[in-house]
């Protein structure tokens, strides 16, 4: 499969999983998290799904909730995708949003300090 088709498939999987979370999943831990990225392996047998938790204290529980809901997610994918094999879903915590927020906070503090020093 070409790179463009792989990217398109990743986007489709992202869309389908996001829809499944909003319509078919009732777990509050899953509903308070966001899928940030999906990366397919070269042979399309494994999909690495990166999630960010809106409640940072529940990272381990949220990852476990996603693992427990893997069957539901794979079923949704099998209904909508026309690929031969549905990839194995592996969930990872993505802390890039949290790191970005920390960087923004640091930059805001530096900007505030510069303002105070110039006054």
From Swiss-Prot:
Its recorded name reads Ribosome-binding factor A
Which cysteine pairs are joined by S-S bonds?
Answer: none
* Subunit (UniProt): Monomer. Binds 30S ribosomal subunits, but not 50S ribosomal subunits or 70S ribosomes.
Domain of life, per UniProt, equals Bacteria
Alphabetized InterPro entries for the sequence: KH_dom-like_a/b (IPR015946), RbfA (IPR000238), RbfA_dom_sf (IPR023799), Ribosome-bd_factorA_CS (IPR020053)
Question: Where in the cell does this protein reside?
Answer: Cytoplasm
- Molecular function terms in GO for this entry? ribosomal small subunit binding
The answer to whether keyword Cytoplasm applies is yes
Task performed by this protein:
One of several proteins that assist in the late maturation steps of the functional core of the 30S ribosomal subunit. Associates with free 30S ribosomal subunits (but not with 30S subunits that are part of 70S ribosomes or polysomes). Required for efficient processing of 16S rRNA. May interact with the 5'-terminal helix region of 16S rRNA.
Species annotation = Mycoplasmoides gallisepticum (strain R(low / passage 15 / clone 2)) (Mycoplasma gallisepticum)
Name the keywords, alphabetized.
Answer: Cytoplasm, Ribosome biogenesis
Query: Which family does the entry's similarity section mention?
Result: Belongs to the RbfA family.
According to its record, what are the GO cellular component terms? cytosol
Q: Does the keyword Ribosomal protein apply?
A: no
Query: A GO term (biological process) for this protein?
Result: maturation of SSU-rRNA
């Amino acid at each position: 499969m070409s790179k463009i088709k792989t990217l398109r498939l990743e986007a489709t999987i992202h869309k389908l999983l996001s829809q499944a979370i909003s319509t078919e999943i009732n777990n509050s831990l899953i509903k308070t998290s966001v899928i940030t990225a999906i990366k397919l392996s070269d042979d399309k047998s494994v999909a690495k799904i990166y999630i960010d938790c809106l409640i940072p204290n529940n990272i381990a529980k949220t990852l476990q909730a996603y693992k427990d809901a893997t069957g539901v997610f794979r079923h949704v994918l099998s209904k909508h995708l026309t690929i031969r094999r549905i990839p194995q879903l592996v969930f990872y915590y993505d802390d890039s949003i949290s790191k970005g927020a920390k960087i923004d906070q640091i930059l805001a503090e530096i900007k505030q300090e510069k303002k105070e020093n110039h006054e």
